[in-house]
Regions:
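Alpha-helical recognition segments enriched in aromatics with Gly/Pro capping
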Residues: 1-34, 49, 109, 130-337
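N-terminal, positively charged nucleic-acid-binding surface of large information/translation enzymes
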Residues: 10, 19-113, 454-457, 461
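Anion (oxyanion) recognition and catalysis
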Residues: 56, 140, 446
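Non-catalytic interaction-recognition regions
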Residues: 59, 94-98, 108-134, 144, ...
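Short, well-structured beta-strand/strand-turn elements
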Residues: 61-63, 143-149, 384, 451-453
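Short, glycine/charge-rich beta-strand/loop segments that flank catalytic centers
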Residues: 65-71, 100-107, 117-132, 150-159
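Structural preference for alpha-helix termini/caps and helix-kink/transition segments
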Residues: 277-280, 284-467
């Protein structure tokens, strides 16, 4: 079955045709490890996880590379300001290495909590200085870079086209440029490949241009080429990286080897908070740990993200998370009920399940259309007959969803003994046909934060999520 991705490079949905069908090569821009990753950052990682899983669902083997930026990313996202790592180290009274190790660990803890697969190769910028220097030297040799008193810059005037991914108007930017940070730059859009370090700069390395450190963009180009070659299949990242970072990666690659590094460029949209921007000043910067502290399994956020296509803005609300928590519980309950189900399936039932699987497959292959795919997941979960074959289909879907659908709901394991005792008392009241007592106990259980639901398989106790 064909796969289609919306390609930022071509501005349309393209049929996926791998360079080498035996191995799909992917590069993802990872975190700058100077602070906690937000749930907005994690939304990008969730979409990248779905991409990996979808390719594997289609039978492909994957080589996925993700970088860890631990030097060179300045606060402006350009060539101005302080290195984010150094700023964080100063504010937290730690060394840059301590900052990097701390936030790298937290990042991977969050990936694990969300059941996001770790890429096959994770590479740190500070461990690839040699490759970056060689890359810059080659750009100098090819005539695409020049030296000033402060840095080595990429000369965008040498390119046949810039920008390629975004709709930036370079001529308008030139006309509107009022202040140039470095008057030695030939063009306002020229960007730093390598930055000469002040004497007191903590993170610096020897280079042909003296003690210095890499620019943000050269890191991904050098590491991507090292592990994936001059050209690979897919490059991913957040939509914010299109004009600030990915344009310059393409420029560097064209300058060094004459090629655009990836054939397909996929970008995830922003996360909104209650319809607005996530902002520290508004007090609405949420982390994965905040979801945990509200009493939710972090995977609930992953399921919540599937309510919206990765190329559309997703609006985060705690009400939405509460609804997703209930949905996760229902899906896991359906899996368990089907696993132990004894209903017989007819030939017509089997054909219908096969059609559901085909529809799911078409949905994920259509630019990772998870909202549509989830409609078929629910069709299977609500299948009238309970049979292990339905559980098997749900488990197959979960190889893409990654929501641990076969896991017994943790809420059941955490129900206090007091509630269990009340549930048992209510059960006895019902057996004695004491409906008044039964209703009173139900209301008491509800007041204590739980709902009881009578099903043909017994009593289901559901925690009421509260903000």
């Amino acid at each position: 079955m064909d796969i289609y991705f919306y390609n930022t490079l071509t501005k349309k949905k393209d049929k996926f045709e791998p360079l080498n069908p035996d191995e799909i090569r992917i590069y993802s821009c990872g975190p700058t490890v100077y602070k906690d990753a937000t749930i907005g950052n994690m939304r990008t990682n969730i979409f990248q996880d779905v991409l990996r899983r979808t390719l594997r669902y289609n039978g492909y083997k994957i080589k996925h590379v993700m970088n860890i930026t631990d030097v060179g990313h300045l606060v402006s996202d350009g060539d101005e300001g302080e290195d984010k790592m150094l700023k964080s180290a100063r504010e937290e009274h730690k060394t840059p290495l301590q900052i990097a190790e701390h936030y790298t660990k937290l990042f991977f803890d969050d990936l694990s909590a969300l059941n996001i697969e770790t890429p096959e190769i994770v590479c740190k910028a500070t461990e690839h200085i040699k490759e970056m220097l060689e890359y810059v030297e080659k750009l100098m040799e090819n005539g695409y870079a020049y030296e000033t008193s402060t840095a080595i810059y990429f000369d965008i005037s040498k390119l046949d086209k810039y920008p390629i991914l975004s709709n930036l108007d370079v001529e308008k930017q030139k006309a509107g440029a009022r202040v140039e940070i470095d008057p030695e730059k030939r063009n306002p859009q020229d960007f730093a490949l390598w930055i000469k370090a002040p004497e007191n700069h903590l993170m610096k390395w020897d280079s042909p241009w003296g003690p210095s450190y890499p620019g943000w963009h050269i890191e991904c180009s050098a590491m991507g080429q090292k592990y994936l070659g001059d050209q690979f299949d897919i490059h991913t990242g957040g939509i914010d990286l299109i004009p600030t970072h990915h344009e310059n990666e393409i420029a560097q690659s064209k300058g060094k080897c004459g090629k655009i590094p990836a054939r397909y460029w996929l970008h995830g949209e922003y996360l909104l908070i209650n319809g607005g921007k996530m902002s520290k000043s508004l007090g609405n910067v949420y982390l994965v740990k905040d979801i945990k502290e509200k009493g939710f399994d972090p995977i609930v956020y992953k399921l919540f993200s599937y309510s919206c296509h990765y190329r559309n803005k997703l609006n985060f609300t705690w009400e939405g998370i509460e609804s997703a928590a209930k949905s996760l519980q229902r899906l896991r309950n359906s899996y368990q009920m089907n696993l132990n189900g004894t209903d017989k399936l007819t030939e017509e039932d089997t054909e219908r399940l096969s059609q559901i699987e085909e529809n799911f497959h078409k949905a994920i292959n259509d630019d990772l259309n998870m909202p549509l795919a989830m409609s078929f997941v629910w069709e299977a979960a609500r299948f009238e007959k309970k049979n292990p074959e339905v559980a098997k289909l749900l488990a197959k879907f979960d190889t893409v969803l990654g929501i641990k659908i076969d896991e017994v709901n943790s809420e059941k394991q955490e129900i206090p003994q007091e509630i269990l005792d009340l549930v048992e008392q209510r059960k006895m009241a019902r057996e004695n046909k004491d409906w008044t007592k039964s209703d009173e106990l139900r209301d008491l259980i509800n007041q204590k934060g739980y709902n009881v639901k009578d099903t043909k398989n017994g009593v289901e106790v559901i925690k009421i999520w509260r903000k």
